[in-house]
Amino acid sequence: MPRSVKKGPFVDHHLVKKVMEAQESGNKRPIKTWSRRSMILPDMIGLTIAVHNGKEHIPVYVSENMVGHKLGEFSMTRTYRGHAADKKSK
């Protein structure tokens, strides 16, 4: 069930503060965050945000297509290495 339009998008306050500081200073360094639940806002377009996946920070460059999605969608937490090969068929 999606979030109510009346409430507006959820973004952690500390992340909004860091985004505003990066825009004012014109700094292109990645913004480190653990907030995977925060929604991507139009203010974040063009910035690189390093999103934590449980082990390390994955750099995510924010483009127009990502607005409205959550940061965690672009930082995978699980690695899929494929199914085990069938040894009998060889």
From Swiss-Prot:
SUPFAM superfamilies: Ribosomal protein S19. Keywords: Ribonucleoprotein, Ribosomal protein, RNA-binding, rRNA-binding. Transmembrane segments: none annotated. It holds the Pfam family Ribosomal_S19. The keyword rRNA-binding applies. The keyword rRNA-binding applies. GO terms for cellular component: cytoplasm; small ribosomal subunit. GO terms for molecular function: rRNA binding; structural constituent of ribosome. InterPro entries: Ribosomal_uS19 (IPR002222), Ribosomal_uS19_bac-type (IPR005732), Ribosomal_uS19_CS (IPR020934), Ribosomal_uS19_SF (IPR023575). GO terms for biological process: ribosomal small subunit assembly; translation. Belongs to the universal ribosomal protein uS19 family. Protein S19 forms a complex with S13 that binds strongly to the 16S ribosomal RNA. PANTHER family: RIBOSOMAL PROTEIN S19P FAMILY MEMBER, SMALL RIBOSOMAL SUBUNIT PROTEIN US19M. This is Small ribosomal subunit protein uS19.
